[in-house]
Amino acid sequence: MKRFKRILATMLALVCVLAVFPTMEAEAGIVTVNGGCTTRATAYNWGAYSTTNSITVVLPENEDDFWVKFTLPKDKRVYARCSYSNENESMYIEMRNSSNVLLDAKYSPEDVLDMDTVIPFMALACDNLTASTQTYYIRVNRGTCSGTMYFTLSMNERIKTGRGTFTFSGTASNPGNSSISLSGVDSSVLSLNLTNNSTIPPGAIVTSVSTSGTQSPSQGNVHHMILPATESSIWYTSTYASATSGNYTINSTDSFAARQVWQFKYNALATAKSTMKSVKLTLAWEYDIANTGYKSY
């Protein structure tokens, strides 16, 4: 009876996972595999990477390992998600490449995420930064667990995107271009420290930058300027002239962290003095949820 209750509890947990698992849409392909994939040579062929296909595994009590292989296109950064229940404590999972090199490993219960929810899981990162599609293997080992085991595997994107708008305090002042320099005159500098801003994901990389502000009096031939001050000493000038807004050539290839000190000033050609207040910085970013405990911001 105790064994029946344990199996029933495990199956109920699995039903909860299937009901609320984020990648299992109505049209998703859910395949049940009843063991038999105990080595690399006999690995279940998952096929090409897809976020809509998942595997429900029934691992017989006389088998220690479950192996699965899949292909991943170039320039993809993904993760494999393995469901977990308390009955499976001591199980562990591994990610390996086609040369059997270990890429990532997670162990229960210490590496289990969302343990206090109905869908605890373990996650394995997989990066294909090569120039072609590659084959990868996942190995699930029962550890010291006894009896038949039940778990679900799925694949998910790791790279997410987001954006935020932040306000500089203070007012930038420009003395005016009294010498009528063709280079114009820069204003005073405003500074904004986003180093510990909790609304920005850890490790977020900037993909675009824009600014806005209110100049008084409003003038022509004004360029906003921005500096990612923690990582660079180079000021970026807006790609167009405007007293109210600026846009910049900064993108993900620059690898600037969103969480850093940003500085702002503006350049004016006009001879008259001016000020700019209500200056805002808008950042778009991408981030790897492997750096956030696999949580989205």
Where are the regions that the model predicts?
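Noncatalytic modules at the cell exterior or secretory-pathway interfaces
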Residues: C126-C145, S252-K273
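C-terminal segment of classical bacterial N-terminal signal peptides
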Residues: V17-E25
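Solvent-exposed serine/threonine-rich low-complexity stretches and specific carbohydrate-binding patches
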Residues: L102-M115, F168-N174, N221-H223, E231-G246
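Beta-rich globular "head" domains
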Residues: S188-N221
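Edge beta-strands of jelly-roll/beta-sandwich modules across compartments, strongly enriched
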Residues: V68, Y136, V140-E157, T271-E286
